[in-house]
């Protein structure tokens, strides 16, 4: 989970996870939701069960990715701002030399909406 400091900094940028809403393709939030979250004191959503499960699984999933794909020296919970577009940012579950790792948890029912059938990665 992000710290209060990280959450405060994120409010100053458009994050990668917010861009679908801004582009009008998110089924969960709208561009207006993002706008009001940025300009007001609206609190971020309270973590739900899926969010908490995903957070708990991040460390073992990153360890698995390191073993599976022969990755070393990954740094966890990395926040980056675009050099070319300073309004844009992203928070990565892990970063390494030339590689970014992002872990997502979905329920069995939600898994059908991710990736292509019979593929190991998304």
Where are these regions (language model features)?
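Mg2+/Mn2+-dependent nuclease catalytic core
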Residues: 44, 51-55, 59-62, 66-121
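Charged, glycine-rich intrinsically disordered N-terminal tails and low-complexity linkers that flank
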Residues: 1-60
């Amino acid at each position: 989970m992000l710290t209060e400091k990280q959450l405060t900094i994120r409010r100053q940028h458009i994050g990668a996870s917010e861009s679908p809403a801004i582009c009008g393709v998110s089924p969960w939030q709208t561009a207006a939701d993002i706008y009001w979250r940025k300009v007001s004191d609206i609190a971020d959503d309270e973590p739900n069960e899926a969010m908490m499960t995903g957070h708990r699984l991040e460390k073992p999933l990153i360890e698995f990715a390191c073993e599976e794909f022969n990755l070393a020296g990954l740094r966890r919970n990395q926040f980056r701002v675009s050099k070319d577009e300073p309004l844009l940012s992203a928070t990565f579950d892990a970063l390494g030399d030339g590689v970014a790792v992002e872990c997502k948890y979905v329920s069995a029912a939600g898994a059908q909406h991710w990736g292509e059938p019979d593929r190991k990665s998304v």
